[in-house]
Amino acid sequence: MYRLLIADDEMIERKVLFKTLSQNLKGQCEIFQAENGREALEIYEKEKIQIAILDIEMPGINGIQAAERIREKDKKCCIIFLTAFDEFAYAKKAITVRALDYLLKPWDE
């Protein structure tokens, strides 16, 4: 069973993504939620997360910073950014941390 983390400071976005993934993956993964980068890193460490879906703009530690810290410890964790920022500079940063994908909000189920 995969261990997946959703980190987004917007509760509605986080809950909708959680519900969508839970329904579509039906027991194939355990899903954890974080409302900021600090909490995401704590959950990552404690739960041995394999897939991290990160918003970029979060209070405190942002998604890029969280991804950088994850990469320092884990080269295999699958990192996906789900963000409203469509600027090239953010996409470039996602590439530098070897993110698997960079998806824009709003997203479709």
What positions do the PLM features span?
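Alpha-helical interaction/dimerization surfaces of two-component signaling modules
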Residues: 16, 20-24, 43
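Conserved sequence signature across two-component system core domains
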Residues: 7-8, 34, 52
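Conserved acidic segment of CheY-like receiver
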Residues: 2-12, 17
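A generic structural motif
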Residues: 25-31
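Conserved Asp/Asn-Gly motif in the active-site loop of CheY-like receiver
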Residues: 31-38
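CheY-like receiver
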Residues: 41-109
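Switch/coupling loops of ABC transporter nucleotide-binding domains
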Residues: 2, 29, 77
